[in-house]
């Protein structure tokens, strides 16, 4: 996908922002949970996002790689009220209905966003 960085003040969700939305589980798309997502672009009316977690996957990197999940550290941000370090999953892009975005949590730093974009493209 075309990855862009264009956060702008206002109510619209823009690439480069971390938002909260419902994310389906991979193993059963009928179930999921509310979590932070980094918006990386658009696909017509859909938003494209990468899920975030505060779980440290460096500890289970071998298992995650074996399962086909790739993670990248992005540090802390206002999307997490406890300011815990976060990781972004770089090999699962999620399509999100803009109406399903619950709130905008923060804008990700441009340099970190560019690093994430490069990792997604790799």
PLM segments and residue spans:
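Conserved functional hotspots at enzyme active or ligand-binding sites that engage polyanionic ligands
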Residues: 1-35, 39-122
């Amino acid at each position: 996908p075309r990855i862009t960085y264009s956060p702008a003040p206002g109510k619209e969700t823009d690439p480069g922002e971390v938002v909260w939305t419902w994310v389906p589980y991979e193993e059963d798309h009928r179930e999921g949970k509310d979590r932070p997502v980094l918006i990386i672009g658009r696909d017509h009316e859909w938003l494209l996002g990468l899920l975030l977690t505060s779980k440290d996957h460096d500890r289970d990197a071998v298992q995650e790689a074996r399962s086909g999940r790739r993670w990248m550290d992005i540090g802390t941000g206002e999307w997490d009220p406890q300011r815990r370090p976060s990781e972004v999953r770089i090999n699962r892009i999620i399509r999100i209905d803009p109406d399903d975005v619950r709130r905008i949590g923060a804008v990700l730093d441009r340099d970190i966003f560019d690093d994430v974009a490069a990792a997604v493209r790799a």
